[in-house]
Amino acid sequence: MKVVACSLDIAWEDKRLNFKKIESILDQLQDGADLFILPEMFSTGFTMNLSLAEDAAGETLQWMKSTAAKYNIAIMGSFPYTQNGREVFNRAYFVLPDGTWSHYDKRHLFRMGEENKYYTRGDEKCIVEYKGIKFALNICYDIRFPVWSRNKGNKYDVLINIANFPEVRIGAIEPLVRARAIENMSYAIFVNRDGTDHNCIYCPSSQMYDFKGNTISQESFVADCNGCRTQLLSCEIDKDALDEFKDNFPAWMDADTFNIIR
């Protein structure tokens, strides 16, 4: 399976422009892909403006569904979601080309950015099976809390974390993501944004590791419709190689047992 991570330069609170930017990038994908991953809050940036929140009938999920169908590719990304007009979640959607989807609500809300004052935290994990591979979904700050993303019972093959992780803390990304890959005996894919917003500066820092902690990404750059140079990382997920490694080095069988108290 081919996975592409897009380090989108997100236009601040401009959904339509971000949709156009992404479509222009997808138009330039060479050799296609099975899964295209966008950063956290890809349609708005890391906003606390809850008036931008949508439900499942809103334009962002509908755009994800139509775009997945148009390009015959699964798409993942998050946006501010509300169901009842009161609670708002930082919700990631994993949308398949046939229009079906799964979602994950961010568990660990970034209090240093006051996300916890505006958003409601999630309490359910999400594992998506697509083309025979199981993906566990995480969002940004979740990467710092390994218990939450622990591959308990060997339930997933790939851990995906989508983020708005600022340049000032860029040094933490590599050890955190690589550790998640090694300790969970899984692939780990981290997808960060690029550009600037009202609070932070970002830089291309998406990363992909195999189950041994080896870097496996191929890097390329394309220009979006706004002229922004966009980093794309790609990798192949080899389920047979992963299964063989787990059979030959079954450290997962000696993992500690635990339960998370909500």
Regions found by a protein language model. Name each.
Residues 77-79, 91-94, 126, 206-208, ...:
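Short beta-strand scaffold segments in enzyme catalytic cores
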Residues 17-27, 143-150:
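Short, acidic/polar
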Residues 59-76, 144-230:
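CN hydrolase (nitrilase-like) catalytic-core segments centered on the catalytic cysteine
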Residues 83-154, 168-175, 244-251, 261:
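Active-site catalytic loop in hydrolytic enzyme cores
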Residues 6, 104, 128, 191, ...:
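Hydrophobic residues at beta-strand termini and immediately following loops
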Residues 1-14, 91, 133-142, 160:
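Active-site-proximal beta-strand elements of phosphoester/diester hydrolases
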Residues 232-234, 239-262:
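Short, basic/aromatic-enriched C-terminal tail that caps enzymatic domains
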Residues 15, 23-97, 103, 166-186:
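Cys-nucleophile CN-hydrolase/nitrilase-fold catalytic domain and related Cys-dependent amidase chemistry
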